[in-house]
């Protein structure tokens, strides 16, 4: 069945950012559509001087493993029936599938006034903001005092726990990094972008309530032993792993968080960053 693309119900803070949604998306047609749209925007700017609205694509992918430009076959540990696609984004190997929120950033970096480093940091900090809001909400089941944060030495968003807390083996990475009396226990979000003539595409993937066993067949992002985590490990989440219509917005007293509520909250944060309302914080320590 072909992908279906539709406008997502959102109200960004300016008219220079459009959001679109694709459900049950096969990877190759989605990549082709991203590249086609990016090339068209580049041509309009170069040939006619036209600036087109930036686009944020919210994607629910069918199962797929993708290899970035730095991807090595040795990081694929098991061959399964899941397709393996080589792609032009940055980074190594990762998995996409239902229950994971993928957001593709089709941005004109010159128009928004960002460097590539700015964009990566905005993406990481937006995810940090929303994950940490969820961890502090009544829906949280956290008992080990965790928080989400980025690292300077490895793109993405990671979960850190207070070193004084009792951390079981299910929540402990073999690649432990200690920062400010906390210990990194795993990764919840991955990033991989491609820049072409100042325009970005590809983006971020956040594990919400997906089946993490798919990561067992790979070294996620090229890191052997990296523990992949999901929001549902620490927050009460609705069990639906694909977008559901007519879910209310996330409220401060919500005891359960849905895929759509998290998505909307993240869209709002990104839209405010795109509009210059939310500035970058100081970069995370190494």
Swiss-Prot record:
Carries keyword Cytoplasm?
yes
What other note does the entry give for this protein?
A: In the reaction, the free carboxyl group of octanoic acid is attached via an amide linkage to the epsilon-amino group of a specific lysine residue of lipoyl domains of lipoate-dependent enzymes.
Q: Which GO terms describe its cellular component?
A: cytoplasm
Sorted alphabetically, the keyword list is:
Acyltransferase, Cytoplasm, Transferase
**What family, per the record?**
Belongs to the LipB family.
Its primary localisation, in coarse terms, equals cytoplasm
Official protein name in the record: Octanoyltransferase
List, alphabetically, the InterPro entries matched.
aa-tRNA-synth_II/BPL/LPL, BPL_LPL_catalytic, Octanoyltransferase, Octanoyltransferase_CS
Stated EC number for the protein is: 2.3.1.181
One biological process GO term for this chain? Answer: protein modification process
Binding residue positions for substrate: 89-96, 190-192, 203-205
For site (Lowers pKa of active site Cys), what residue positions does UniProt give?
A: 187
Q: Which residues form the signal peptide?
A: none
Q: Tell me the GO molecular function terms.
A: lipoyl(octanoyl) transferase activity
This molecule's function is given as: Catalyzes the transfer of endogenously produced octanoic acid from octanoyl-acyl-carrier-protein onto the lipoyl domains of lipoate-dependent enzymes. Lipoyl-ACP can also act as a substrate although octanoyl-ACP is likely to be the physiological substrate.
Q: Which residue intervals define the domain BPL/LPL catalytic in the entry?
A: 50-278
Reactions this protein catalyses: octanoyl-[ACP] + L-lysyl-[protein] = N(6)-octanoyl-L-lysyl-[protein] + holo-[ACP] + H(+)
Tell me which PANTHER family the record gives.
LIPOYLTRANSFERASE 2, MITOCHONDRIAL-RELATED, OCTANOYLTRANSFERASE
Which pathway does this polypeptide act in?
Protein modification; protein lipoylation via endogenous pathway; protein N(6)-(lipoyl)lysine from octanoyl-[acyl-carrier-protein]: step 1/2
- EC class (word): transferase
